[in-house]
UniProtKB/Swiss-Prot annotation:
It catalyses: chlorophyllide a + oxidized 2[4Fe-4S]-[ferredoxin] + 2 ADP + 2 phosphate = protochlorophyllide a + reduced 2[4Fe-4S]-[ferredoxin] + 2 ATP + 2 H2O. The gene is chlL. This is Light-independent protochlorophyllide reductase iron-sulfur ATP-binding protein. Mg(2+) binds at residue 16. Coiled coil: none annotated.
């Protein structure tokens, strides 16, 4: 059975870029990897392929939903380093359920026996939406990975995703592998959160402009490093993540914080972060002046 990962995180946090570079890192470690984009924008695999590949839902519509008329090469495309790529797609804007499309994608790939040939399957899932449909990849995953930054909103979203992992772990052998901090110059708020809600931190990537450029170019950092070896140090971050995942860590079943409690914890940290610490004796001296 392939090792299956589900990557979640706040919308716009760099989740797809992170997913593509992790997939490339896993391929560099000799693994056969399938990345499945689960977002109606169907741009999850752009960094691997360099173009927006046709979606499964588009292909199904072309075939009048006759699954028997679809072959693996109709929906699976080649990406950098031999990573295979699939985009689920979605319904027209404002109509239908994107989560339903994720289910149809898994159904089709199973009928094609597409999962059997891979060592690792990575689901890159839409934003921080954790409704039943978009939480569906957690039903198939061995591990969930949450991409965040050092900000309030991303960690608040991470906490909600952690709650989904805990709920799914009741009935599935699912664990949270940990957090990845993406393009952040600090990690103090991440540390504050994981002290409050214990979970591993797999890696924290610094504020490196080439990570953003990777997305815009439609190239992984590994492909960019093939042309500019000075970027090899950035690839090492993703290789470190890949090595941890391939080691099959124990992971955790997280116990998320209550929303109001987390809101208070994180907002207090922001509001008081720059205030100097004053001990009781100093405070008394100030009062007597």
């Amino acid at each position: 059975m392939p090792l299956t990962l589900a990557v979640y995180g706040k919308g716009g946090i760099g989740k797809s870029t992170t997913s593509c570079n992790i997939s490339a890192a896993l391929a560099k470690r000799g693994k056969k990897v399938l990345q499945i984009g689960c977002d109606p924008k169907h741009d999850s695999t752009f960094t691997l392929t360099g173009f927006l590949i046709p979606t499964i839902i588009d292909t199904l519509q072309e075939k009048d939903f006759h699954y028997e008329d679809i072959w693996p090469e109709d929906v699976i495309y080649d990406g950098y380093g031999g990573v295979k790529c699939v985009e689920a797609g979605g319904p027209p804007a404002g109509a239908g359920c994107g989560g339903y499309v994720v289910g149809e994608t898994v159904k089709l790939l199973k009928e094609l026996n597409a999962f059997d040939e891979f060592d690792v399957i990575l689901f890159d899932v839409l934003g921080d939406v954790v409704c039943g449909g978009f939480a569906a990849p957690l039903n198939y995953a061995d591990y969930c990975i949450i991409v965040t930054d050092n900000g309030f909103d991303a960690l608040f979203a991470a906490n909600r995703i952690a709650a989904s992992v805990r709920e799914k772990a009741r009935t599935h052998p699912l664990r949270l592998a940990g957090l990845i901090g993406n393009r952040t110059s600090k990690r103090d708020l991440i540390n504050k959160y994981v002290d409050h809600v214990p979970m591993p931190v797999l890696e924290v990537l610094p504020l490196i402009e080439d990570i953003r450029v990777s997305r815009v170019k439609g190239q992984t950092l590994f492909e960019m490093a093939d042309k500019d070896p000075m970027l090899s140090y950035v690839c090492d971050y993703y290789l470190n993540i890949a090595d941890q995942i391939l080691a099959k860590p124990e992971g955790v079943i997280p116990k998320e914080s209550a929303d109001r409690e987390l809101f208070t914890l994180l907002s207090d940290f922001y509001l008081n972060a720059d205030k100097p610490k004053v001990n009781a004796e100093e405070e008394l001296d100030l009062m007597m002046v």
